[in-house]
Amino acid sequence: MSELKRTILYQAHLDAGATMVDFGGWDMPIQYPEGIIAEHLYCRRHCGIFDVSHMGRIDVEGPDQVAFLQHVLSSNVLALDLNQAQYCIIPDANGYAIDDAYLYRFEEGKYFLVINAGNIDKDWAHLMNEAKNFDVKLTNVSDKYAAIAVQGPESKKILMTLSGGRQLTPENVKNALNS
């Protein structure tokens, strides 16, 4: 058996008393001493921060990036404005789901696709095979960056505090849920 990969936050998880498990080949926390119900409720009522560094991350660039993404994803890429994300499916040629993913558009001319940790190799092979028919550049940056997800009703307030009051999200977000 191969050794499990560890995120940059591995030691912080241990220091916080996390119970670690094999998750798609990564040594990831499944719960902390307070228990999963308390963690769930805290996130729903306040804010939770999740280490998602194990997820696959792919930069998509090039003249045919939109056509490529329209071809390999189930969602309408053209509906995505700057600083937005959308949930999508990566279907095979018959329309069956290979994986689900999130597509981000952080800047003009560049998209960022986040895929599941356990499917990185399979998804990468599929996307690279499909990319042969497009003028597009795919870069697997999964090992280049750590990543966290900040979720819950107090997320915006906490992010603004951490950023010194800098606005990190657009004021009006399409499809946003407000509490």
Locate predicted features:
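Basic, glycine/lysine-rich polyanion-binding surfaces/domains
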Residues: 1-179
